[in-house]
Amino acid sequence: MVDFSLKKHGVSSWGRGSLSRKESSAGDSSSTFKSSRYQDMKVSDPELPKVSAKERSKAGTMMKRRLSVHQSNNFGAVKMDFDNMPALPSSAADYSFASNVGNATQTSLITEDQLPDRNTSLASLNTNTRRPDQELYSSKSLRQILSNPDFKAKKFITEKLGDATAVDIDQFTSNLNDLSLEIQDEIKFNIDKSFKEILIVNKGLETATTELKVLRTKVQEMKDIMNQFVTIAEKKLQAEQAANETADLNRTSSSASLSNHSLLPPLKPTPSATRKDRTSVYILERMWNEELMTLFKNVDGAHKYITSTPGRHILLESDNWIEINPATLKPLQKVRLFILNDVVLIAAPKPSKQTELTVSRFSPLRDVTVEVQSEHELSFNFSNKQHTLYRHRDPQVFSKVIDIIRQAKDALREISQAEEDTTRKIRNSYTLLQQERTPNRDATTSPVKVHGRQRSYGGTGTPSRHRSDAQNDALLTNITRSIHVRMGSEETTEVTKRLKRLDDALEDLDLEIGRQNFDLAITKLNHIQSSLKSLYSSATFDESVMVELLSLKCSQRKTILYTKLTNLLACETSDMTKLKSYMLNLVALNEPVDALEVFLQNRSNFINDLTLQIGIIDNVTSFITQVAIIRFQTLKKVTQQYLEVSKNLKRDYTSLLVCWCSEEVDKHFQLMERELSNSSTLSVQAIKITRKQIDELKPVGMDYVYKLDDFIRRNNNRIL
């Protein structure tokens, strides 16, 4: 501890100290005054010792303790005795003057000539022993000095701190320590800032890496799609080029045939030109197969239930569904729904590995009944009488799953209906072919016999033949050509020219029949028949034979038209516009009875098909209600259709319609009695709905309320 107090020193001691200093200064006046105590030191620049930050901090703390003054809590103002204190020199001149006076009183060895030199030495001492500038003590100045690349520590200490006091050195050390702490704080701050920036950059790099991976996948998919587009475009260009070549070839052949008057038909296009481009179908099937392969990879055991059949594909994959216990309504497990176009697969996590999926439920879509239990719950009823309940929080996903399942069921229903229609058409076609191959068959027999219904009226009595239509057609063609050759050798008359034109018109008629332009074909046929009748009276013998042959060919075309129209009328089930058109065409062929009979038989089959689609229902009232609506609404539409067609009829065939409607009503009540035999009672609601449907027939002129009254009278005791 440094004691700065002056109380222990008296005036005498201060004076003696001053005289001793004067004597020493007088004794040394002959020697050169040194401005610095380190002036004569000739030492090479040594390497400064390396002091750690901890030691520098410790040294600074020790210096502070040396220079500290401890004061008590009850410290008061210090009473200083200024009378016993010597007067201090105010400047260098006063100091030199006081020194000269003291030396003069002590010794006479110093002369006045030596005073100027001493004053000069004192002045130089005053100049060299100045304190360092206060600016050196600031952190900013020290930072600039130490950051200079040409900084030399020994030179700086010698020049700036050579004559510094302990207080100045301590202050300088404290400033260095503070600067060191500031630099350490800045280093820590910069490290922390750099670390945060590195974390941000790493996060950005991670995001960029993920996006690049996704982008790479998207780019690869885009390349595949572009390759597919290129393939499709090339196929289309090839098809267009082939079509153009075919058109040029047809044009050339047609021009050649016109120039040569050839009877050969134009050249047909090659199969490659007419073949449809199925590239898009192949691409779609490949995408579906890839989706199925992904399903097999992600769901363990899925390949055991689902096979990669053509056309099978995934419609929807929905996650985050919860299976609920129907009894306790508690969650059981998390599941994922896979809705395919024909099956439903439900996958759940494995007990050992929650990240892997395994098959939990599987069933064909036709055997699954989906019911909405609440806004977020779905109930799946499987064919094996299993009942499961699933819940999802998102209402949009919930609605989407329901819509996809309904659309898939509707598509399956349409496919089944189309398959049934195709099977029915094939069966009817086989039946008609078998009937056509039977010898001694009336050519105009209605196909209603195929369906088990006997005709009530006869047709146009054309003679029966033992040959098939193809043989007859070939025979008539050969005979016609021979007659044409015979008539061509003679003089050509106007009747002969007209007969040739009519023969050519019959050839064109075959094209219209093949294209199913029945209206135009029937119009041409009637025109040809009327023209032949007008030519028969003025024709010669050979020309009359030609007229008879052309009449036979017209009858043959009429038979072909009749067969095609009755077949189409018997097979069509849904399009009422086509049914009406076929009926009108048959009426134009003078076959109104067969047209009406085939149409009525078609509607009977339609009612039976709709009744079978209802299926087995435990509720008798619901079943009777649906059957009544189907049957009586069909009767109403058939009656309205007949009233529209009857405007073109020369006779009234309402009796056929009335008999058919009566039979259908009897079938309905027979069905109700059969249901009564299975069930003990019948509700009044079914009777009311049946009565309402019967009343709707009254506006079209049909009243069968009496049949309902007879049924109620017979089964009054079983109606509740």
From Swiss-Prot:
Coiled coil feature spans: 168-252
Main location, first listed in the record: cytoplasm
Compartmental location: Cytoplasmic vesicle, Secretory vesicle
Protein transport as UniProt keyword: yes
Cross-link (Glycyl lysine isopeptide (Lys-Gly) (interchain with G-Cter in ubiquitin)): K188
UniProt biased composition (Low complexity): 253-265
One Gene Ontology cellular component annotation held by this UniProt entry: transport vesicle
Segments for region (Disordered): 1-63, 243-275, 434-470
Chain intervals with Polar residues compositional bias: 26-36, 243-252, 434-447
Keywords: Coiled coil, Cytoplasmic vesicle, Exocytosis, Isopeptide bond, Protein transport, Transport, Ubl conjugation
Basic and acidic residues bias locations: 37-58
Any single GO BP term: Golgi to plasma membrane transport
Subunit text: Component of the exocyst complex.
Similarity field: Belongs to the EXO84 family.
Role noted for this protein: Involved in the secretory pathway as part of the exocyst complex which tethers secretory vesicles to the sites of exocytosis. Plays a role in both the assembly of the exocyst and the polarization of this complex to specific sites of the plasma membrane for exocytosis. Also involved in assembly of the spliceosome.
Entry protein name: Exocyst complex component EXO84
Organism in which the protein naturally occurs: Kluyveromyces lactis (strain ATCC 8585 / CBS 2359 / DSM 70799 / NBRC 1267 / NRRL Y-1140 / WM37) (Yeast)
Gene responsible for this protein: EXO84
